[in-house]
Design a protein with these regions (language model features):
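The feature captures the LRR N-terminal capping module
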Residues: 2-89, 94-97, 103-109, 113-117, ...
Length: 224
């Protein structure tokens, strides 16, 4: 018995079926990441970073951890679905555009001098031990922020939802205005070791349960 198969002159076997079925969906991502990997500086673990990026994308993971890889930069196109990004303890001087889904950003102990536009749903911003001189507008969703050990002179408006702020060892000369109103949020803010010379009267708007730490500043005897 013989079996006749239809002839398809346009058919050809893929050189790598896994790449075509899995990574074909993400070809633009993979191509950009592979190019970025080839531009690695000595000591950077970009091969490990790309491996984690691809795994994150293929598995649709909501967390991407690229910390402690001695990276000097990140690729421009991060996985769009992530809600947590950890790039702490690298050599980063800037960050690319961040996914709009991001809720937690950890980028401590780098060399950042500025931050990109922050995602609208961001809840936690941890960027202590950098070289930041200012901050972008803070999203209303922000709950916790650590900006200690930077070079920040002034703060943007603080979100009403912000519960915990650590701004120790910066160059702040004044505290932000506090407009508590009927907001039930119990706050704990740390402004120790700055250059603050007076306390705004708006601090009296805070609930009794709130704590403002301002030791080791330049407060005068008539600070309030």
């Amino acid at each position: 018995m013989s079996i006749m198969l239809p002839i398809n002159n346009n058919f050809s076997l893929p050189q790598n079926s896994f790449y075509n079925t899995i990574s074909g969906t993400y070809a633009d991502y993979f191509s950009a990441w592979d190019k970025w990997e080839k531009q690695a500086l000595p000591g950077e673990e970009r091969d490990e970073a790309v491996s984690r990026l691809k795994e994150c994308l293929i598995n649709n993971s909501d967390e991407l951890r690229l910390d402690r890889l001695n990276l000097s930069s990140l690729p421009d196109n991060l996985p769009a679905q992530i809600t947590l990004l950890n790039v702490s303890y690298n050599q980063l001087t800037n960050l690319p555009e961040l996914p709009v889904t991001l809720k937690k950003l950890y980028s401590a102990s780098n060399k950042l001098s500025e931050l990109p536009v922050l995602p609208p749903a961001l809840e936690s911003l941890q960027v202590q031990h950098n070289e930041l001189e200012n901050l972008p507008a803070l999203p209303d969703s922000l709950l916790t922020m650590n900006i200690s050990y930077n070079e920040i002179v002034s703060l943007p408006s603080l979100p009403q939802a912000l519960k915990n702020l650590r701004a120790t060892r910066n160059f702040l000369t004044e505290l932000p205005a506090f407009s508590e109103g009927n907001n039930p949020v119990v706050r704990e803010y740390f402004f120790d070791r700055n250059q603050i010379s007076h306390i705004p009267e708006s601090i009296l708007n805070l609930r009794n349960e709130c704590s403002i730490h301002i030791s080791d500043n330049s407060l005068s005897s008539h600070a309030l």
